């Protein structure tokens, strides 16, 4: 029954949101109460307390923004705005925007592209969302050599974007589930590094609406996510 199924989805969604918000709310409340009660008047400790509150509030804000984006895409409230744009220029901009965060974690992002320009036909804003979520996911799970490689290749009329990060492979049994909302392969690590299990579900929603391929491949020394774009000349 469709009504029963929708109620189950709604209940599961609310349960997941409540679970995700519980930890940051508890941390914010605990550290705010500590500041109010004057547990420490040491400036360094007070600065640390304030830092935790700001970080956790930022995580909640980020999660709410992603949920709103996902809701708009899944329920068809946002139409694709198709246009021709340079995917190399877009990726260069996104990589530059993420270099500071990556370097703070000792991670190097490499985007060594031979082609200076590759035009694609898509919704530039949505594709920016896809690339950003892939790179964010790579930063959150990068390990071992601490390296992320972004590359673009032409495959017939399509253009494929790859985002590879060194680190642990995704267990094969988890791969079909990683595109689901709130799904986390390594819950302890995800909490530590700031993931919320929503980014890849946004990728899936966008690529499904666009009708192009996307996926993930385990490599010998890491994991590679990819997606395809229309590279045919359009007027």
Where are these regions (language model features)?
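Short alpha-helical segment of the dimerization/phosphotransfer core of two-component systems
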Residues: 55-63
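Conserved micro-motifs of the catalytic ATP-binding
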Residues: 75-80, 119-122
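Conserved catalytic submotifs in the C-terminal HATPase_c
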Residues: 81-85, 103, 108-118
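Short helix-loop "hinge" at the ATP-lid/N-box region of the Bergerat-fold HATPase_c
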Residues: 138-139
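Short beta-strand/loop element within the Bergerat-fold HATPase_c
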Residues: 145-157
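Short conserved segment of the HATPase_c
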Residues: 170-184
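Glycine-rich ATP-binding loops of the HATPase_c
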Residues: 211-217
């Amino acid at each position: 029954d469709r009504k029963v199924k929708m109620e189950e989805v709604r209940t599961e969604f609310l349960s997941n949101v409540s679970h995700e918000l519980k930890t940051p709310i508890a941390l914010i409340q605990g550290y705010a109460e500590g500041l109010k009660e004057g547990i420490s008047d040491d400036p360094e400790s007070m600065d640390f307390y304030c830092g935790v509150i700001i970080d956790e509030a930022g995580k909640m804000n980020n999660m709410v923004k992603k949920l709103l984006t996902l809701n708009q895409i899944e329920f068809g409230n946002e139409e694709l705005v198709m246009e021709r744009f340079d995917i190399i220029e877009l990726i260069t901009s996104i990589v530059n925007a993420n270099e500071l965060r990556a370097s703070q974690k000792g991670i190097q992002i490499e985007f060594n592209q031979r082609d200076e320009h590759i035009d694609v036909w898509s919704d530039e804003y949505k594709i920016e969302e896809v690339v950003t979520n892939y790179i964010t996911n790579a930063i959150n799970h990068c390990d071992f050599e601490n390296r992320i490689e972004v590359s673009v290749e032409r495959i017939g009329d399509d253009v494929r974007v790859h985002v590879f990060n060194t680190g642990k492979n995704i267990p094969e049994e988890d791969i079909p589930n990683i595109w689901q909302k709130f799904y986390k392969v390594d819950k302890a690590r995800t909490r530590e590094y700031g993931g919320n299990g929503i980014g890849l579900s946004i990728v899936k929603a966008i690529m499904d609406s666009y009708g192009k391929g996307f996926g993930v491949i385990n490599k010998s020394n890491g994991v590679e996510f990819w997606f395809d774009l229309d590279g045919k000349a359009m007027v």
